[in-house]
Amino acid sequence: GIYKKLAEKRGTDVSSFEVKSLIGELDFVSKQLYQMEDVKQLMLEIADSYEKNPAMSESMDKQYGAGTAEYLGKAVREFYK
């Protein structure tokens, strides 16, 4: 899925086209999933959780590799700048 692809990009500049396109996919899927036109606020809140909620970051890092939660948070923030 998208998270796995993003985890594989860990270390790539979050402002790169590849990373922004993956976050764009995540944005699209989230709009469908949550039936919302604009998911920016929701995605930024999720990014906060990945970075500041130890349980969420540990879970994400355990599944996709150390540093994934922090990287994902930064990538989401960059996309919605």
Language model regions located:
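Amphipathic alpha-helical "stalk" segments
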Residues: 1-81
